[in-house]
Design a protein with these regions (language model features):
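Classical protein tyrosine phosphatase
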Residues: 151
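Catalytic palm subdomain of template-directed nucleic-acid polymerases
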Residues: 147
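A short alpha->loop->secondary-structure connector
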Residues: 154-164
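Active-site environment of non-heme Fe oxygenases that use a 2-His-1-carboxylate facial triad
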Residues: 2-117, 122-123, 130, 135, ...
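Contiguous, non-catalytic segments that form substrate-binding/exosite surfaces or channel walls
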Residues: 165-170
Length: 327
């Protein structure tokens, strides 16, 4: 087992780091800069690919969670289509919940009964943990319900897949909206790509299971790309174990003005025979109104290469999910 832990470490005696230079890296990965940085670092130290893996990390992972986009031939392999009977069961669960007079936060398997669909959802949950790691449920009649009832259905169905909801923000919200705010908010007030039409780069969200509900079909684009982090790991472990070592060491995670101004933790862990990667690029590069803070340690050249390598390998092995309204 690896010696790293998931603990966030608060930093004391934070200094000004303006004299230390942040690498030439931005939120949007630049393939040419990545290739140049890789060539430069390997030229300076040709032995980097010979670096031993961190203690406890496997040379390769064998699992159904290791896959490439080309392994999937048709969306019928990951899309589960709801039947008319199952949609009627969901509607009955909505009416049952309203009859209880409870707040939306009480949506659960007991308050949102799905006697026949529930076991199917539990089976799909097992597919997340022990199978391919993803699925699409298609499709809920969004226009037939109020937004409040849509949230109820989302929470009720999700409770059969992952019964414990995680906080999305410091206020304790468990539901976040992905919406373009660039036309209604000042240009300098948006610090996250989820609130623009900008392309989001590969990242992981906090939580064991992450779900999305599509309220509309995109007029343009709209494909959501996912990738197997375990497949990316195998490629790195084989060709660039030094970057595995870099990812498994502490990184300064920007707090963007919080107290403390940054926390220190690895991005990559191997615990209980499972690989865990937890990162979002903007905490190391900044994004629009939230640039990388100047009073925290800049990332290193090795870390910059690791970030870009993660992205471009994930992109290479990715699968596109074409979300439809109600998915």
């Amino acid at each position: 087992m690896a010696t790293e832990t998931l603990t966030y470490v608060k930093q004391a005696n934070v200094q000004e780091y303006k004299h230390e230079k942040q690498p030439d890296i931005s939120y949007h990965p630049d393939k040419d800069k990545w290739r140049q940085r890789t060539a430069r670092r390997l030229g300076e130290n040709p032995s980097l690919p010979l670096t031993p893996l961190p203690q406890g990390f496997p040379e390769q992972i064998e699992s159904s969670l290791v896959w490439e986009g080309k392994d999937w031939k048709d969306e019928s392999e990951w899309v589960y289509n709801l039947s008319i009977d199952q949609l009627e069961e969901i509607d009955a669960a909505v009416n049952h919940f309203h009859g209880l007079g409870l707040h939306l936060g009480h949506a659960s398997q007991s308050t949102f009964p799905l006697p026949t669909l529930g076991p199917v959802l539990r089976s799909l949950s097992q597919e997340l943990h022990s199978g391919r790691g993803f699925f699409v449920l298609r499709t809920l009649p969004v226009d037939s319900y109020s937004r409040s009832d849509i949230v109820l259905i989302y929470a009720g169905i999700s409770s059969y897949v992952a019964p414990t909801r995680g906080r999305q923000d410091k206020e304790g919200g468990v539901l976040s909206h992905i919406k373009d705010l660039s036309t209604s908010q000042p240009a300098g007030s948006i610090g996250g790509p989820a609130y623009t039409t900008d392309k989001q780069v590969f990242h992981t969200d906090i939580g064991d299971v992450v779900s999305l509900f599509a309220l509309e079909t995109a007029k343009e684009g709209g494909i959501s790309r996912i990738s197997s982090s375990w497949r990316v790991y195998n490629e790195l472990a084989k060709k660039r174990p030094d970057l595995i070592k870099t990812l498994a060491e502490p990184w300064a995670v920007d707090g963007f003005g919080a107290d403390p101004p940054y926390t220190s933790r690895p991005l990559l862990y191997y615990l209980d025979q499972k690989l865990i990667i937890q990162y979002a690029r903007r905490y190391f590069t900044g994004f629009l109104a939230l640039p990388r803070s100047s009073n925290i340690p800049p990332i290193t050249e090795a870390q910059a290469e690791a970030l870009d390598t993660l992205h471009f390998l994930a992109e290479e092995f990715s699968l596109g999910l074409n979300f439809q309204k109600g998915d």
